C-alpha cells in the first residue's frame, strides 16, 4: 500500500506490476536523457557568442532530428506493447471471480462455487478499530489464493466504475452492459488495497477494495466455511 509522502510507485506484488515498474524506469531514463540534452543545448545557446545568420538550411540536422525521435518512440513502444499483450493473456485460470460495481459498493461472486457471493462495503470511520485504515477497510474482504492465476470478470449495475489495485498493477473499467476481464497473481500473502478509480457519484471516494491473498490451504478452509 502507499505511505504518506511516498514519491515512487507501490511495491510490486504481481509479475505484471514488476514489468510495469521496469517499464517506468526504462521510460524515465529516456525522458531524463532527453531533458538533459535539451537543457545542455539551451545553456549553449544562451552562453555562446557565435551566431549563424548566414545559415539558410541544414539538411543533416533535419535528418537527425527526424530519425532520432522515431527511434526513441520505438524504444518506448516495444516494451509497452509487450506488457500490453501480457496483461491481455489469460491461460487456464485456477479461479474466476465476478465483480460488480454499485453506487457505492462492490459485490463479488466466486463462479466456481455454487453459493459463494457477498457485498463489500466500506467501514465507516467511527466504526474503525485501532490500526485499521480510514476509507480503505471493508466489512468483507476478497480472499484469494496466492501464486495462482485468477480471472476477474468486472462489470457494473449502474454507472461507470473502475476496479483498481495499484500494487498488483490492476485497473479495469466496470461498464454497465459490458463484461471486462483481467487476471491477477500475487507472489506473496498479505492485504492489498485499492479503490474505485472512476468518478461515479457523490460517494465515489467510499468504494475501497481489499484483497486478502492467502495460501491455498487457508483459502480452501475459508471457502468451505463461506459456502
From Swiss-Prot:
Here the disulfide bonds are none
GO CC annotation terms, alphabetical: mitochondrial inner membrane; respiratory chain complex IV
Q: What ranges does the Mitochondrial intermembrane topological domain annotation cover? A: 1-14, 88-227
Q: Reaction(s) catalyzed by this protein? A: 4 Fe(II)-[cytochrome c] + O2 + 8 H(+)(in) = 4 Fe(III)-[cytochrome c] + 2 H2O + 4 H(+)(out)
InterPro entries for the chain: CcO_II (IPR045187), CcO_II-like_C (IPR002429), CcO_II_C (IPR034210), Copper_CuA (IPR001505), Cupredoxin (IPR008972), Cyt_c_oxidase_su2 (IPR014222), Cyt_c_oxidase_su2_TM_dom (IPR011759), Cyt_c_oxidase_su2_TM_sf (IPR036257)
* Membrane topology of the entry: Multi-pass membrane protein
What positions does the entry give for Cu cation A1 binding? 161, 196, 200, 207
Entry's transmembrane regions: 15-45, 60-87
Q: Name a GO molecular-function annotation.
A: cytochrome-c oxidase activity
Q: Does the keyword Transmembrane helix apply?
A: yes
Q: What cofactor does this chain's UniProt record say it requires?
A: Cu cation
Organism name: Vulpes zerda (Fennec fox)
Cofactor binding notes: Binds a dinuclear copper A center per subunit.
Biological function: Component of the cytochrome c oxidase, the last enzyme in the mitochondrial electron transport chain which drives oxidative phosphorylation. The respiratory chain contains 3 multisubunit complexes succinate dehydrogenase (complex II, CII), ubiquinol-cytochrome c oxidoreductase (cytochrome b-c1 complex, complex III, CIII) and cytochrome c oxidase (complex IV, CIV), that cooperate to transfer electrons derived from NADH and succinate to molecular oxygen, creating an electrochemical gradient over the inner membrane that drives transmembrane transport and the ATP synthase.
- Primary location recorded for the protein, binned into one broad class: mitochondrion
What is this protein identified as? Answer: Cytochrome c oxidase subunit 2
User: What interactions and quaternary structure are annotated?
Assistant: Component of the cytochrome c oxidase (complex IV, CIV), a multisubunit enzyme composed of 14 subunits. The complex is composed of a catalytic core of 3 subunits MT-CO1, MT-CO2 and MT-CO3, encoded in the mitochondrial DNA, and 11 supernumerary subunits COX4I, COX5A, COX5B, COX6A, COX6B, COX6C, COX7A, COX7B, COX7C, COX8 and NDUFA4, which are encoded in the nuclear genome.
Q: Where in the cell is it found?
A: Mitochondrion inner membrane
Q: Which domain of life is it from?
A: Eukaryota
Which family, according to the similarity comment? Belongs to the cytochrome c oxidase subunit 2 family.
Q: Which residues carry this modification: Phosphotyrosine?
A: 218
